């Protein structure tokens, strides 16, 4: 009996021990799976474009961003409010500290300084030279940033495109302002977060959201909310950062956009502003309740991570400061193997071009290739490089001379050279990139060759070009713009700045 009891007790202990081990292993597997899921789930930013500065205070538009912000604060959620400078100044002039303080508990960014007032950003930049446009944007949008910081107590971490207000000069100006660009027309496959014009860009507004005209009516809102079960997985799959456009606060109440006042280039003064038709005030209670339901729904999903663009700037805003011999050689081989201006995951084509030129220039003087170099970030060329070179072949000495001239031009101008000339003809930036790649690989392995063929090469990177150009051209269709707005120069400038394009990596 004693032996039987002992055996039973031992068996029980063994079973308990095995069960505990099994439970511990299952728990570890669950935690690993949860961690892996968290690693792959996309970041989603709840966005609000706070715009209407034309409607009178009596229309109640100012109250809507307040209750949107308060609702999120109550729920422990957050988002990014992009505020037009003129709207912020309007709230300040009306004494609406309550609205300002409610939004200031969240991320506040710029939605351009003057919004739909003509000339818009695009109209201002329509025919502006690159550097001229950058300086204009630094003045105009820098002043808007200053006002937003003074009013909300936080410096904008990003500026979000307002309607069709775009220009690569604006994006480049933001690089000098230390801010990101949101709702950008620029992206790469699988990457909504990219570097373009030396600025962190976040593409698009997502393929969902836009509940503006549905919040006030359950019959409209309910099917849109239910559709998110399929739309969110489909619209976020394989992406890094996605904008969920919550609403234009004023459009929650108004039936038409407030800036119909400015359509087709019209520029009325305050005495001529018309108030858009409004939904009944009592419908705003339904709108507020449905907005809460939307936030609850988004919070309940375990396949996305709600965040802000300010947090995303921190997450994606770091990039390598140096490049070493092995990495540069790897990119040079890709350029030659693929026969195109390649976009590396860590280094833009402009950064690669600058590094190759600097390395060869150093070799020409010192006889050695630097083991590691500081990463320089020039802008793309100011004019389209020729695809066909005017020179069929150069000597090794000429290749090193061209590299030295390119290196000096970048240092002085801050741009890649469009082309460099020899006595018999000129060589475009793409062909120079290929030439420098081959010469660099040779000097890394021993010495420069006696001569090099100069090959035709694309004038800029072409990855995702068609999609980017289409989005830029579509900016002309914004109803606020003049009907004769010409996007030709801005499209071309965007193509040339694709030399600065690369994925942004979470670090």
Label for each model-derived stretch:
Residues 36-104, 242-245, 250-252, 260, ...:
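Active-site beta->alpha N-cap acidic-glycine motif
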Residues 77-169, 189-193, 242-249, 274, ...:
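Metal-dependent polysaccharide deacetylase catalytic core of the NodB/CE4 family, i.e.
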Residues 16-17:
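C-terminal motif of bacterial Sec signal peptides marking the signal peptidase cleavage site
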Residues 117, 154-261:
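Active-site-adjacent pocket scaffolds in enzyme catalytic domains
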Residues 1, 21-37:
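Ser/Thr-rich, Pro/Gly/Ala-heavy low-complexity intrinsically disordered linkers and tails
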Residues 73-76, 182-189, 249-333:
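C-terminal domain-boundary segment and adjacent tail
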Residues 49-59, 82-87, 126-136, 155-162, ...:
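The substrate-binding groove and active-site-proximal loops of carbohydrate-active enzymes
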Residues 1-9:
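Sec-dependent signal peptide recognition
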């Amino acid at each position: 009996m004693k032996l039987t009891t002992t055996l039973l007790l031992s068996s029980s202990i063994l079973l308990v021990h095995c069960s505990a081990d099994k439970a511990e292993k299952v728990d570890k597997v669950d935690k690993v799976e949860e961690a892996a899921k968290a690693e792959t789930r996309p970041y989603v930013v709840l966005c609000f474009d706070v715009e209407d500065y034309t409607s009178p205070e009596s229309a109640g538009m100012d109250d809507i961003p307040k209750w949107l912000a308060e609702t999120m604060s109550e729920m422990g959620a957050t988002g990014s409010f992009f505020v037009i400078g003129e709207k912020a100044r309007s709230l300040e002039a009306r004494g609406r500290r309550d609205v300002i303080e409610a939004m200031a508990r969240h991320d506040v960014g710029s939605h351009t300084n003057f919004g739909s007032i003509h000339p818009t950003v695009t109209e201002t930049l329509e025919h502006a030279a690159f550097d001229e446009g950058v300086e204009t944007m630094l003045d105009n949008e820098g002043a808007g940033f200053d006002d937003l910081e003074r009013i909300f107590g936080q410096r904008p971490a990003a500026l979000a495109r307002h309607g069709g207000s775009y220009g690569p000069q604006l994006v480049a100006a933001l690089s000098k302002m230390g801010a990101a660009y949101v709702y950008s027309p620029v992206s790469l496959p699988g990457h909504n977060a990219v570097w373009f014009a030396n600025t962190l860009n976040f593409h698009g507004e997502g393929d969902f959201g836009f509940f503006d005209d549905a919040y006030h009516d359950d019959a409209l809102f309910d099917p849109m909310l239910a559709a998110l079960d399929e739309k969110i997985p489909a619209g976020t799959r394989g992406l890094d950062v996605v904008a969920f456009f919550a609403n234009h606060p004023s459009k929650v109440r108004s039936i038409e956009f407030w800036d119909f006042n400015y359509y087709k280039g019209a520029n009325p003064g305050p005495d001529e502003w018309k108030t858009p038709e409004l939904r009944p005030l009592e419908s705003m209670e339904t709108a507020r309740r449905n907005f809460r339901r939307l936030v609850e729904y988004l919070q309940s999903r375990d396949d996305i991570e709600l965040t802000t663009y300010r947090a995303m700037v921190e997450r994606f805003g770091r990039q390598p400061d140096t490049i070493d011999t092995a990495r540069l050689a790897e990119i040079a081989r890709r350029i030659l193997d693929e026969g195109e201006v390649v976009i590396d995951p860590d280094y833009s084509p402009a950064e690669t071009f600058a590094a190759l030129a600097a390395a060869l220039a150093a070799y020409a003087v010192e006889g050695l290739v630097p083991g590691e170099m500081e990463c320089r970030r020039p802008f793309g060329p100011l004019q389209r490089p020729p695809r066909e070179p005017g020179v069929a072949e150069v000597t090794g000495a000429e290749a090193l001379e061209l590299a030295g001239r390119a290196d000096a031009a970048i240092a002085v101008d801050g741009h890649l050279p469009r082309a460099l000339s020899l006595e018999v003809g000129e060589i475009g930036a793409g062909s120079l990139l290929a030439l420098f790649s081959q010469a660099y690989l040779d000097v890394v392995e021993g010495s420069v060759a006696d001569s090099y063929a100069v090959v035709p090469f694309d004038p800029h990177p072409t990855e995702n070009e068609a999609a980017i150009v289409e989005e830029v051209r579509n900016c002309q269709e914004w109803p606020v713009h003049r009907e004769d707005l010409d996007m030709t120069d801005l499209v071309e400038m965007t193509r040339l700045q694709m030399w600065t394009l690369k994925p942004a990596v979470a670090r």
